[in-house]
């Protein structure tokens, strides 16, 4: 037992303060799980002296769900001091104290668990951030910017850049169903799969087809993911795109912004799936925007969606800006639209502008 002792002001406690759970009057109450009244401690062999003035003692176990979590112990300098009234009153007090002590213990345990969880989540956030590659610094003939905002510490949105060579780049954006740690882990698996396929220099439709098979083999808790994948060929200025259920990418070209209207099944649901591929030759100033549904489907306080139309108008209005400026303008406008409300969904954005 760990002892907490109160005596009269100015008096010292002498004697043994450490004891096994079965020793002394306190130990007897704990062992028997019932009150122990000792009228004269000097004739009771179980007594362990703490205060030489003690003549009688009352020990009442504090029980919680049939388990002794402590003992309420009172000592008196008078012989035969404690009565049945003391036993009844203090038994009620001991029961209430037991509940309070257990609640305090559970609160402390909860606080420790929450602190550990927070440390784990922060570590997961750092790891996830490290998995997302920065925009390439090599000259692929594109200005690029990527933005990533999580509704929680970690999320299921992802983007990736695959270097196919000095002239060719793969660009991906994906969204795992659900949120939180499980979605983030599944997203990390998807990034690993893409990187393992990169040496094959797969074009978009074939990349999504192979990812669908590999993601499906590693499906966790019924999760799936949407993804959009594109390849860019510098020199030829050729863009190829395929889509697996992701928000349709946007393309600013010839003075207007429109959707690249490609559809396809999300990855990891059906085994044998093929994907359509669309290609276009781009010119300087053309802009490609990949975006997760957390942008267009963001709602304001009046239950209005930000919407793809608003997003396309923004791109048209700021088409002369850099890729970085366009990405920042989009996120600022979404924040303004929602009055800076907390994120209800992850927001991920990749902007590529042809130099």
Model-derived regions: residue spans:
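Sensory-domain boundary capping and coupling elements
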Residues: 26, 60-78, 100, 292
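Short beta-strand-to-loop transition segments that serve as allosteric relay/switch motifs
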Residues: 42-44, 55, 71-80, 176, ...
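… and, occasionally, acidic/histidine-rich disordered N-termini of signaling adaptors
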Residues: 109-289, 339-355
């Amino acid at each position: 037992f760990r002892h907490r002792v109160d005596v009269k002001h100015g008096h010292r406690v002498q004697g043994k303060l450490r004891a096994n759970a079965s020793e002394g009057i306190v130990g007897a109450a704990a062992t028997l799980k019932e009150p122990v009244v000792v009228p004269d401690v000097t004739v009771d062999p179980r007594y362990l002296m703490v205060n030489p003035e003690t003549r009688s003692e009352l020990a009442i176990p504090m029980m919680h769900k049939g388990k002794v979590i402590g003992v309420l112990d009172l000592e008196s300098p008078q012989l035969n001091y404690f009565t049945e009234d003391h036993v009844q009153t203090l038994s009620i007090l001991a029961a209430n104290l037991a509940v309070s002590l257990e609640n305090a213990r559970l609160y402390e345990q909860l606080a420790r668990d929450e602190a550990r969880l927070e440390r784990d989540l922060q570590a997961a956030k750092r790891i996830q951030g490290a998995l997302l590659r920065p925009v390439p610094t090599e000259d692929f003939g594109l200005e690029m910017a990527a933005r990533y905002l999580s509704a929680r510490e970690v999320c299921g949105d992802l983007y990736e850049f695959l270097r196919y060579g000095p002239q060719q780049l793969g660009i991906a954006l994906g969204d795992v169903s659900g949120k939180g740690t499980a979605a983030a882990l599944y997203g990390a698996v998807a990034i690993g799969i893409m990187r393992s396929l990169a040496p094959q220099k797969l074009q978009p439709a074939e990349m999504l087809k192979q990812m669908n098979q590999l993601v499906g083999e590693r499906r966790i808790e019924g999760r799936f993911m949407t993804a959009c994948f594109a390849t860019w060929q510098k020199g030829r200025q050729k863009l190829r795109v395929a889509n697996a259920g992701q928000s349709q990418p946007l393309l600013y070209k010839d003075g207007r912004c429109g959707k690249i209207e490609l559809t396809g099944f999300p990855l990891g649901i059906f085994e044998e799936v093929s994907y359509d591929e669309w290609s276009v030759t781009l010119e300087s100033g053309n802009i490609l925007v990949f975006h997760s549904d957390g942008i267009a489907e963001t709602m304001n306080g009046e239950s209005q969606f930000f919407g793809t139309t608003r997003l396309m108008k923004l791109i048209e209005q700021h088409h002369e800006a850099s890729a970085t400026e366009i990405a920042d303008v989009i996120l600022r406008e979404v924040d303004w639209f929602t009055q800076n409300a907390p994120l209800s969904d992850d927001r991920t954005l990749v902007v590529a502008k042809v130099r």
